[in-house]
């Protein structure tokens, strides 16, 4: 399923909004530092999220971390996949630091949401799909591609990438709680399994019989 909200132009429009917000927050004249930190944390999370969406669909993309004026040069080269992943992780780390311990209303970015986003992008980055030597050993598709670095890692330690993904996944599970009725040591009936799945997928909001409304507590980021 591909939504129009994930297209290139829309994502960069939202990234620009984040850039403008961060620039304005840095020069804001009000004295509420806690509010400045919270707003900055949300903007960093959203900027990382939008870049993560772009990387999912396009691989390496131009990294833009400032707002542009009308007379500036807009011809910006695509960054490597590795650089994009690094940028997203940095955005998540900034959001985690700024939002840690902050109680947020439903639908707003949280430290746990940033931990989850970091875990997701590092898991994607560690996969075979983004290790160019592995791909080249399995298919000739990339043999004529001039810029493999925008599709994945052309070198580096794969084990280290998996380890980073593992550490990030453990961090979000420890912070947010995990395992809603998914204990593999306690099998359930097929019907109960369906109800558990619906409860998780719908966040407890489904009206289907048997759905557990308490599953809403498992939602890390939603609207």
Identify the role of each PLM range.
Residues 59-61, 93, 112, 120-223:
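An aromatic- and glycine-enriched ligand-binding surface/loop that stacks and positions planar moieties
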Residues 66-72:
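Short linear capping/connector segments at secondary-structure termini
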Residues 1-58, 72-108:
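Conserved, well-structured interaction surfaces
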Residues 23, 52-56, 117-127:
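Short glycine/serine- and small hydrophobic-enriched flexible loop segments
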Residues 44-47, 115-121:
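TPR/Sel1-like alpha-solenoid repeat signature
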Residues 11, 36, 41, 114, ...:
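Hydrophobic packing residues in well-ordered alpha-helices of helical domains and bundles
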């Amino acid at each position: 399923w591909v939504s129009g909200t994930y297209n290139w132009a829309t994502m960069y429009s939202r990234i620009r909004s984040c850039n403008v917000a961060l620039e304005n927050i840095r020069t804001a004249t009000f004295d509420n530092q806690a509010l400045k930190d919270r707003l900055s944390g949300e903007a960093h999370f959203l900027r990382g999220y939008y870049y993560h969406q772009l990387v999912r669909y396009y691989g390496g993309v131009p990294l833009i971390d400032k707002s542009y004026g009308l007379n500036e040069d807009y011809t910006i080269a695509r960054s490597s996949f590795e650089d994009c992943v690094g940028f997203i992780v940095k955005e998540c780390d900034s959001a985690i630091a700024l939002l840690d311990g902050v109680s947020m209303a439903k639908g707003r970015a949280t430290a746990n949401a940033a931990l989850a986003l970091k875990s997701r992008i590092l898991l994607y980055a560690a996969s075979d799909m983004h290790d160019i030597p592995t791909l080249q050993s399995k298919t000739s598709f990339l043999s004529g591609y001039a810029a493999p670095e925008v599709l994945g890692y052309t070198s580096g330690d794969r084990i280290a990438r998996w380890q980073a993904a593992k550490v990030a996944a453990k961090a979000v599970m420890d912070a947010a709680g995990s395992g809603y009725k998914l204990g593999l040591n306690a099998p359930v009936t097929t019907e109960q399994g369906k109800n558990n799945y619906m409860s998780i997928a719908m966040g407890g909001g489904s009206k289907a019989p048997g759905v557990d409304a308490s599953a809403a507590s498992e939602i890390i980021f939603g609207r």
